[in-house]
C-alpha cells in the first residue's frame, strides 16, 4: 500500500460523483488541483510561521455545516470522508486570517514526533502500544459521560466517550489522539482509499498504536469514524 498526500482516490473521485459532492471541484482534475493547492498553502504557512495548530479535541457537531472543536461533544462520527473534508473548512467561521481543514497525514506524523520530543510520550507509546493513553478496547480509565457523571470505562469493553472527557487520554493538552473514534486524514492510501489514524474504541492499543496507518473507502460512515481538524495562518 502506497500512502500519499495530496492525491485523489481514483475509485471514488471521478467526474460523475464529484459533481454531486459539493466539494468545490466537479472533475477529477479539478479536485486534484484543489488538493495540491490546499497542501502547498499549508506547507508554505508552516515554513513561514513555524508550525500549525491541531484540534485539542476530535471534531464535534460533524453532521452540521459548521463543526466545532469542543469538549464534551458526542456528535463526532457517522459521516463520510467527503462530508468531513468539506465541513472542516468551515470551522474558521468568518476569520479570514486562517484556514481550517481535516488534518493531513504529515501533520499527524509531526504531532506524534512532537509528543516524543517534548517527553510527553515515548517512542514505544507511539509506535508499539498506545493503550496507556487512549480509549481502546483493552484500556480502563475514568471519564465524564454525556450526563456529566464520572463513569468507568472497563477493560474489554467498547465505549465511545465524549470529546476531552478523560484525563487518561490527554497528551500535551490534546485529547483522544489515539483511541475513541478513528480519525480520517487527507492522506490517500494507494489509488482507491483514504487513510485514518489513531486507532479506535473497539480496537487494541497494541495492534493499532498512534502511528499505525489503515484505510477504508471514503464513502464509508459509521460510529467508528471521525476526524481531527487542523488550522494554519494564511
Provide a role label for each language-model segment.
Residues 176-177, 224:
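Residue-level recognition of short, solvent-exposed, well-ordered loop/turn junctions
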Residues 178-186:
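Active-site-proximal beta-strands of protease catalytic cores
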Residues 1, 48-49, 220-225:
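Extracellular interaction modules
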Residues 61-63, 182-183, 191, 203-204:
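Eukaryotic short linear interaction motifs
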Residues 3-6, 13, 55-57, 187, ...:
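Structured loops at beta-to-helix junctions and adjacent beta-edge loops in soluble globular domains
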Residues 78-92, 98-103, 168-169, 190-234:
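Disulfide-stabilized, aromatic/cysteine-rich ligand-recognition loop
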Residues 3-176:
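Short aromatic-cysteine micro-motif
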Amino acid at each position: 500500500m502506497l500512502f500519499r498526500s495530496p492525491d485523489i482516490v481514483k475509485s471514488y473521485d471521478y467526474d460523475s460523483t464529484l459533481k454531486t459532492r459539493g466539494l468545490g471541484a466537479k472533475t477529477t482534475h479539478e479536485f486534484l488541483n484543489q488538493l495540491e493547492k490546499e497542501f502547498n498553502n499549508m506547507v508554505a504557512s508552516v515554513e513561514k510561521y513555524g508550525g500549525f495548530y491541531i484540534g485539542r479535541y476530535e471534531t464535534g457537531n460533524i453532521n452540521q455545516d459548521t463543526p466545532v472543536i469542543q469538549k464534551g461533544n458526542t456528535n463526532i462520527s457517522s459521516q463520510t470522508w467527503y462530508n468531513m473534508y468539506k465541513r472542516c473548512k468551515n470551522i474558521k467561521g468568518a476569520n479570514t486570517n486562517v484556514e481550517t481543514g481535516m488534518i493531513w497525514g504529515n501533520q499527524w506524523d509531526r504531532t506524534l514526533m512532537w509528543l516524543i520530543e517534548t517527553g510527553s510520550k515515548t517512542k514505544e507509546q507511539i509506535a508499539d502500544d498506545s493503550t496507556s493513553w487512549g480509549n481502546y478496547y483493552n484500556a480502563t480509565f475514568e471519564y465524564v459521560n454525556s450526563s456529566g457523571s464520572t463513569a468507568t470505562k472497563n477493560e474489554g469493553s467498547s465505549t465511545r466517550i465524549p470529546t476531552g472527557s478523560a484525563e487518561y487520554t490527554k497528551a500535551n493538552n490534546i485529547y483522544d489522539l489515539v483511541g475513541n473514534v478513528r480519525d480520517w486524514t487527507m492522506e490517500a492510501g494507494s489509488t482507491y482509499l483514504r487513510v485514518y489514524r489513531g486507532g479506535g474504541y473497539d480496537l487494541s492499543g497494541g495492534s493499532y498504536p498512534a502511528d499505525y496507518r489503515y484505510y477504508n473507502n471514503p464513502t464509508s460512515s459509521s460510529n467508528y469514524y471521525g476526524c481531527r481538524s487542523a488550522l494554519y495562518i494564511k
